Amino acid sequence: MKVLVAPLDWGLGHATRCVPVVREFLRAGAEVELAVVKANANFFREVFPELRQRLAPSYNIVYPKHGYNMALWLLKNSMHLNSVMRYEHHFAEEMVDRHGYDVLFSDNRFAFYSKRAYSIYMTHQRRIAFPRAFAAFERIGVMWHANIMRKFDEVWVPDLEIYPGYAGSLSHSGATPGDKPMRYVGTLSRFSDWDAGENAGNALGSALGYVPAPVDLERDVDLMSVSEFMAHSANVEWNAASEERASGKQTFGMRALGMRAAYKVVAVVSGVEPARTQFEQQLREALQQIPGQHMMILGKPSAEQKTWIEGNIEFHTHLATNDFAEAVKRADFVVSRGGYSTVMDMAELGAKCIFVPTPGQFEQIVLAHDLSKAGYAVEIPADELSAETLAIAFEKSVKMPKVEKQNLLHDAVENVVRRFKERSI
């Protein structure tokens, strides 16, 4: 069974939560390949250096600076979104024709399905939340999303089936795929297989682990014709132990760099521009004023991995999965955006979280508010982030609820494998 996994490129969260999905398909004996863009290619290459990557079209989304513009922005850009979706669907059909995929797995890529492959769509946002001023659009959003779901063979929801789970009303109400199957597959975190006793500080097999060199995808993919895109991308693929490893090039793991025993704050910068850079600047200014040692992870997996220190802040362009987990474990508090993939990761690691939702991403605002209300995390609006508000947050006693061992994802993958075998008979 040949599977192509394609996460949406609105930030890195969709890529990180695909990690356990890829692992489970590999355990089931599937041949897995990855549809990547420039922003997530290096991340996947570090986690799955042995898997072939194929260049996929990018949605090229830039969020507005101010949250109150988001609903109007969505309407304004609906024609662009529809153009990308039409193109994406043609691309998916072409990939099945050229490479013979049996299963297409789409993490929130709205049109990544094919009539000639079993197509799975994953989303935690059955309900697309809008600010109160634009609540009238919410019903339209639900109807639109339901129409998207019905074009796939199966829909997966990365949450617990029993309300409220971790995403609350976002995952437990709203769109349904009609008569198509919909399965809750549990929380999905790239850290679900991380074991502190065996893997802490071991980026890719050793304390001085190899980290693949940056992948150059030449440029972001524009809306070119399908034939042009396929001609451009047909041979853009990478395989595991190739020339980079042979060259002997190494990047040192965090222990070799002298990782500190503890950090007051580990700040994780993520998301799309321009909000990502604004968040980075806010955190720099705030942490410089707060006593103690801090770490900032800049969330730039497409950049060369670098580490440096400025004052009381240790900077990393990005970290391998196990190094990231170790850093979070050593932090008194983690400050990050409140995307759902981050919520699942922090719950898996048992972190004390301060969430600063991305302006305009109302989903993050809803999640952060609900988690704060439940006593699981602290919420700080982006326009209020400062050394003073962080100091107040440090006084609060919060911790993400523990993630219990689940077999929901395993069962979902086994069900797909069983369907494939039945079709093949």
Residue ranges and their predicted role:
Residues 323-366:
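A donor-sugar binding/catalytic signature common to diverse glycosyltransferases
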Residues 9, 27-78, 241, 314:
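Conserved nucleotide-sugar phosphate-binding/catalytic loop shared by glycosyltransferases and other
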Residues 69-111:
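Conserved nucleotide-sugar donor-binding subdomain of glycosyltransferases
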Residues 207, 221, 226-230, 392-425:
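C-terminal amphipathic helix plus adjacent low-complexity
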Residues 7-19, 274-277:
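A short, glycine/small-residue-rich beta-strand->loop->alpha-helix junction that serves as a flexible
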Residues 51, 115-185, 190, 209, ...:
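Active-site-proximal region of nucleotide-activated glycan assembly enzymes
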Residues 190-242, 247-333:
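Donor-nucleotide binding loops and adjacent catalytic segments primarily
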Residues 15-25, 40:
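Short amphipathic alpha-helix
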